[in-house]
Structure formats: C-alpha cells, structure tokens
Amino acid sequence: MERQMEPCQLIERSIIKKYRKELWTPFIVAVKRYELVQAGDKIAVCISGGKDSMLMAKLMQELQRHSDVPFELVFLVMDPGYNEINRQKIESNAALLNIPITIFETDVFAVANNSDKSPCYLCARMRRGYLYKKAQELGCNKIALGHHFNDVIETTVMSMFYGSQLQAMPPKLHSTNFEGMELIRPLYLVREDDIKAWSCLLYTSDAADEARS
C-alpha cells in the first residue's frame, strides 16, 4: 500500500516530477550557467509571500538537498508594515511549504507613504537596502530575489522606451553599498506562466493528484 504523502512532500515532488521541464530544469541551468551558488555560500532567500519567492525558496531547498556543493540558506521575510492578515498569510504559507522563515520589521510603508518621491520606487530601494543589511547581519554573503524571465524582459523593454539608456536585469550583481554582498536571481530563466501553473497546487483540492502525475 502506497504511503500517504504530506501536502508539502507532494508540492516538492511536483517540482522534480510534473514541472521538472518548466521549473527545475531552467532553474538549474541558470544556477550553473551564471554560477549563482558557490561552495561555502550563505544565501538569504528573500521572501515577499508571493508565488515567485515561495517557489524560489522551494527550489533552493531542493538544490541544497541534492547538490554536491555545500552551502547554507536563510529564508528572510521583511515586514514593511503588513496588516495582520497579510502577515499571517505569509506565515501560514511558509509553514505549509516547510520553509523556516525569519521575519524582521521595518517602516518602509510608512516612510514611502510620507515621501514626495514615487512610493513604488522608494519601497523597492528601501526594501533592498534593508534586506542587504539584515542578510549581512546574519552572516550571509548573498541575497536571492524572485525575479523571473518575464521580469527581465519587461525591465529591458521598459528601459528602451522610457529610459535614457538601455538597462538590463542581470542574473547576479555585486552590491556597491554592502561590501562582500552579491544579489542573485535564481528564477532568471523561469517563465511566469509556469510559476502560475505550479502555484495552483497551493490553492486547489486536487493538489495530490496534480503532484503525482
């Protein structure tokens, strides 16, 4: 008789089995092609609570589990001023996926809302700075962000039409403000539609059947 698998195990299995071609393969290609993970790295996987960062966290867990290269992971959640419902949702999804998150509070929303500058731009800048700082405090040398293939294309196209110069979103980037820190984007080759398809496993009652197929 087949042993009943837990929801988290089914979701993890789906990454390696059902969505191997769409998720696992492009993830591994990006990690190897751009040399995103090195022996001895301590990587802060930055989780916003959305589908992209949650998938990234599971992929990084699977990589650590199967890799011959030793490295450490910290799963970092910056609370910019979430309401209680949003924070609880992040915590419950992380628990479902067996992701041991570390949450730290900031005042990003409050500062951005009281600024004359674009709130979205300011939020993004402040968020990244806080993530770098906290990751460094925890002894990490890298932060991983959940930008995917479509984000990369959109950023490039937007800079062509609205920017004064062509700007790309590289797969890795050395920080100029935090010495010894590097930003990596493990989902660089993963497409948004495939992430959406996988994320349905978290919200449907047919997750077990989907993951086994």
Predicted regions and their residues:
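Short, flexible loop segments at boundaries between secondary-structure elements
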Residues: 171-190
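ATP-dependent adenylation/nucleotidyltransferase module used to activate substrates
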Residues: 2-162, 170, 193-197, 201
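CoA-thioester-processing core
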Residues: 167
